[in-house]
Each structure stands twice: as C-alpha cells, then as structure tokens.
Amino acid sequence: VTDVDASKCMVAWARENAQASSLADRPCRWIVDDCAKFVQREIRRGSRYDAVIMDPPSYGRGPNGEIWKLEDNVYDLITLTEQVLSDKPLFFAINSYTEGLSPAVMEYVLKTTLCPKVGGHTSCDEIGLPVTATGGVVPCGATAVWEE
C-alpha cells in the first residue's frame, strides 16, 4: 500500500487510522507529495500498481499559487494515473465531493480511459451521510469504480 497526499496532516491521520485498525505492522509507504508529481515519477521509474483508490481534493493551490480544480482536471488525473496500473489491474476507484461532478461523469471517464485498454466494467453511485432521526440519506459526494 502506498498512501500519497499533499497534506502532512492527512498522511498522519491515515497512519493513525492504520494503527487504530491494527494494520500498523503491514507494509505501507506514507508519502507527503503532490499526487500528480508522484505518479509522474512512478511512471519514469516503471512502477506498477494492481489497484488505485483516488480521493482527490475539489480545489487546491500549488506552491506557486497555481489553482487546481478537480472538475477541470479529473480526466487528466485519471489518464495519468492509469499509466501506473499493472497489466492485470484489480480495480480503480475515485471519490469526489465536488459539486457539479456527478457519479455518471466520473464513471464515463473511467469507462472511456480504462475499458478500451484493459476491459472490465464500471459502476457509480452517490456517497451519502445517513440521517438517524429521519432514516434518510444526505448526498455529499460521488464515487465511480472500474473493476476487472
């Protein structure tokens, strides 16, 4: 497992979650870095991964003030990252909490980028928070998955 996040706090939190889940002794690399730059280096190194779980931010600023928006970059991020998938990948999942980026759009990007190269199928859904008092669910995001 390789956990990559540009936020030192998020990486620390992920490490704490692994420890709380009794997974601290499992092999995991904890990397604080820009995910796209990390993937570009992994491509040059020839690294390959069997699975990807992506939870990119909706919005961010680079060190030089560059503005990054997921809805403008989701296709490029997925096409970059699919280059590090192994020859027989297991799955590729992406979550988003970005208004205006629907589950169907994310599924379409996975379907048009991954399926022609490695086959498989895609699915998508909304992410929701359960409301105990009413038994309802408040939509708060989207998820899309490609599987072999």
Go through the PLM ranges and name each one:
Residues S7-A51:
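S-adenosyl-L-methionine
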Residues V1-D5:
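Conserved SAM-binding motif I beta-strand of class I
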Residues R15, I43-R44, N64-I67, V105-E107:
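Short amphipathic alpha-helical segments
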Residues M10, V32, D50-L80:
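Mobile active-site "lid"/loop adjacent to the S-adenosyl-L-methionine
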Residues D34-A36, S58, T98:
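Active-site-proximal loop/turn and secondary-structure-junction residues that shape catalytic pockets
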Residues L85-D87:
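Helix-to-beta-strand junctions that scaffold the AdoMet/dcAdoMet cofactor pocket
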Residues P89-E148:
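C-terminal catalytic and target-recognition region of SAM-dependent MTase-like enzymes
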